[in-house]
């Protein structure tokens, strides 16, 4: 039996009556002896091999781990600088499965849900995280050893950071360790929503045709072996099949990835896979599964070992899986949930009948600006977004891109002030506390460019608009991929897994025009536009001869 004691908005899980009485005695002692270990600033977690373990707190300049026997010790300590979750976690049940438990999910959906669970009427909406990839093992192991709890540090633009203890991730399953548990969980009657962060390229959609790619080896394996899936499509299909056969009711699949019309993309991917595998299930999905579109926004950097040390030192805890993010957050969702949903609007989520205008604004301004900045800034020797944006040349370049190139194609949604939105973007990019990595923005360009850059570039070409900045971006992307050395002589590795072997042949071609046939550009024949080609060829040569900064200065004139 776990007793939960609420003290100064903190929850203490005490395993038995003896420990509960010990806690009460320490409360009395605390009146006379000051701060007692285990009373203030300490969170107790039940663990498999320990009666309980405490989150560490900072004691002067060193970190102390508290074990159960130290409750008898009187010490002076500063409180851990973390706001605990404001609910009894033992009362939370799981109503959401999330596939792809990365940093963004833990800073975004979990953040909203963690707040919402303080409402007793919403406590059926805890989250079960599902990891499916081999690379997920380290994060899975780190979270499991601390009962899926972690700290989220929100970094303010005013240099004030606030750390939260996140308790909404009630369960965590690693598909490579227990695939049957994944299928069973998706089929469970209490699960009403499957949310996804599987990256822009994870939906396996051909960029040119817009069709789901059935021919990949992993997809072919899952089509032929429905009971032993390897892909997200196979796992979801297996779970839905089990759900259908057990008559466990409808369910919503909600994409939280940076894709325009991400719900439509998710529907295309999953329904195409299921139609190729199981016609009966395909019919069931058509009437029992909805795919709302959504727009998500919160800059969440990759976490390095140095970040872990820094965050834990600042927060006074020992967290093996901390995450940090900016203070801006937004989530806009089409209200199309067939099996019910959390009242996320109580904690700031916006619901609408059509998310398109919000998607277009965010993808065209924020995400496109990230890509426009990433390659030239990295080639100039910068490694962090905030450092690059504090270079007035790059800030001006982004401002011109947003104002001149993009704003004509972005109608403001709702009551949004686009001028203020763009100013806020530059402030967010320059947030010194976040220090997002340019390498993260450079990665996976082949799946980002068709979504963030190409839709507006196509319109710009049709309108015979000024193409200098997008030509500069294209030339910088080629230089980044082809030479893999920045202007300061630093060698780097490229992480762009969606580039094909044919793409790499074209990248290595000495003729720069071959690059314009790359798969990310297939939605429009760039080679046919004389103005774009002229600008692009001039900039390719200039980047090689003069370097990014000197070329950028000519563009800004």
Named regions from a protein language model:
Residues 30, 34, 38-41:
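Residue-identity detector for glycine
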Residues 6, 12-14, 29, 46, ...:
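Short hydrophobic targeting helices and cationic amphipathic motifs
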Residues 71-557:
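Substrate/ligand-engaging "lid" and interaction regions
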